[in-house]
Amino acid sequence: GIGVKEGAEYRFSVWARGENQKLRIELIRNDTMEERQAFESKELTVNSKDWKQYEVILKSPRTEPKAHLRIFLESAGTVDLEHVSLFPVDTWKERKNGLRKDLVQALYDIKPGVFRFPGGCIVEGTDEATRYEWKKTVGAVENRPLNENRWHYTFKHRFFPDYFQTYGLGFFEYFQLSEDIGAEPLPILNCGLVCQYQNDPDQQVSLSKLDSYIQDALDLIEFANGDVTTTWGKVRADMGHPAPFNLKFLGIGNEQWGPEYPERLKQFVEVLRKAHPEIKIVGSSGPQSEGKDFDYLWPEMKNLKVDLVDEHFYRPES
């Protein structure tokens, strides 16, 4: 269900096409036998053969932890719907497609110095096709693709059969949030390795095919810091932030291990040092805080002269 609160407003939006088709948008309780399940409804008319975005505001008269959204076609005919969304109006800084106020406030209150994103095996993906690609997370929200989440095959106890990510929160929102809470952004990019737990070395991106991955890193720096006359700086400006985000750090690779990692990282370092000596490169010491992989990677990171090494600790509090 969808949790709604008494007195709160929710923005329903949809991309639709059709000729004079009336829709009724409802918030309902489907666990009741009452004749009228809807406790809030609004109408809208789809009046164009071309794709067009429509919005109505629903105001909940009561608190319902498990409400449902229902869309009725009021008359005979055909209407196409795409990118259906129900979103709270009251978000952090009142932004459309914004973040929950209470969660951002909690982040702000702990005064983080660094904010790492997207982090974890999400960066790697289950395979190359499902890796996290930052360019797919910027621009109009309705044009961002759905992607299978890395943890889709891992947790049997999840509440839903499918586990996907919509990229509704992408790199623009991430940089903006980092700015809001006063933290230095630390974006992590794929280094040409997908999940090493699930893939053999011969299934990884070959060293001769890393150019597009390295270009993604260069373009991300341009998106964050570039002038509005540059390709990716203009994308940032068009999204509402002409000023640069002042990116200082860039992580290449998540919790990678073995010789496959430094031999790929080396190519990134060589290009980034020449193109952006001002950016501090962050490497990784792997998924463990000690042991064979850790002991192997630290000297490799020193040889590559990365600026910082991202150590990960998985230990009980004791």
Task: Identify what each model region corresponds to.
Residues 9, 102-105, 173-176, 180, ...:
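Alpha-helical scaffolding segments of alpha/beta enzyme cores, especially the outer helices
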